[in-house]
């Protein structure tokens, strides 16, 4: 996979939050969130990139990968981590761990024919909130 396609797939992952598979929609979502909260938008983009890269490195389903499916839950985790934990080394660590965990949960559900939608995002954020008692 070239770096150009990795960035393209990352933007598709952002757009998949609203069930779109379009790099321009992903870019517009990024710009809109950036306008409101610059750090949250960067966390979102980084989380989506990391999840996409991880899915590629462990050779997950190529069609799902190319359509950005492995990135959208991580995009949501990125925004939630910044919202609940702020900007710190700790939150970056959570972002990395959460991005990888969403991919693993999503792949488990996919292989077992479960509809997952945003369940990986919900489970990861609930886990983080429960572990670190921020309610």
Q: What does each of the following model-derived ranges do?
A:
Residues 129-135:
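Juxtamembrane boundary at the C-terminal end of a transmembrane helix
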Residues 56-64, 107, 111, 133:
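Transmembrane helix-loop junctions in multipass membrane proteins, especially transporters and channels
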Residues 25, 39-46, 67, 89-93, ...:
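Short, aromatic-rich membrane-interface segments at the entry and exit
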Residues 61-76, 113-117:
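Short, non-helical or kinked segments that cap or interrupt transmembrane helices
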Residues 43, 47-51, 55, 59, ...:
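Alpha-helical transmembrane segments in multi-pass membrane proteins
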Residues 4, 59, 84-85, 114:
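Juxtamembrane helix-boundary/capping and inter-helix hinge elements in multi-pass membrane proteins
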Residues 28-34, 76-83:
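Generic transmembrane alpha-helix signature in multi-pass membrane proteins
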Residues 1-60, 132:
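N-terminal signal-anchor module of multipass membrane proteins
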């Amino acid at each position: 996979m070239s770096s150009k396609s990795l960035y393209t797939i990352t933007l598709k992952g952002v757009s998949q939050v609203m069930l779109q598979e379009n790099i321009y929609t992903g870019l517009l979502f990024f710009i809109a969130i950036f306008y409101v909260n610059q750090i949250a938008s960067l966390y979102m983009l980084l989380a989506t990139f990391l999840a996409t890269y991880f899915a590629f490195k462990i050779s997950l389903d190529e069609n799902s990968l190319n359509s950005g499916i492995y990135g959208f839950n991580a995009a949501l985790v990125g925004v939630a981590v910044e919202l609940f934990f702020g900007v710190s080394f700790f939150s970056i660590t959570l972002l990395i761990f959460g991005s990888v965990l969403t991919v693993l949960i999503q792949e488990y559900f996919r292989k077992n024919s479960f509809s997952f939608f945003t369940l990986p995002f919900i489970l990861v954020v609930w886990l983080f909130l429960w572990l670190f008692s921020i309610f």
